[in-house]
């Protein structure tokens, strides 16, 4: 199953986001587990400051997807004011392949 996740940061969490970013990236890019990241990145406010997270990933089921998100260092640091996990049903193929950037 495909999932999308949107996490909106609590106000004043930019310092926490920057301090936790490396471990967050390692967690979401871990291809050894049952979850496979397709794409993702920080959401930005009008001024360009990071203020949230977007992830699109594949997981066997909703429970596994939720466990993956609960183990994310961003979540464990208490960074999010809100979190939304939704199943995603692909209706149209993407015109280009999504690739993971470093």
Regions found by a protein language model. Give the residues of each.
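Conserved, structured core segments of small domains
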Residues: 1-102
């Amino acid at each position: 199953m495909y999932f999308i996740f949107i996490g909106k940061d609590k106000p004043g969490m930019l310092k926490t986001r920057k301090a936790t970013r490396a471990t967050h990236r390692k967690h979401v890019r871990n291809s050894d587990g049952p979850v496979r990241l397709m794409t993702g990145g920080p959401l930005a406010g009008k001024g360009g400051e990071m203020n949230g997270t977007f992830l699109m990933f594949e997981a066997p089921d909703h429970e596994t997807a939720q466990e993956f998100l609960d183990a994310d260092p961003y979540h464990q640091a208490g960074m999010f004011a809100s979190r939304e996990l939704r199943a995603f049903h692909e209706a149209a193929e993407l015109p280009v392949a999504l690739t993971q950037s470093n």
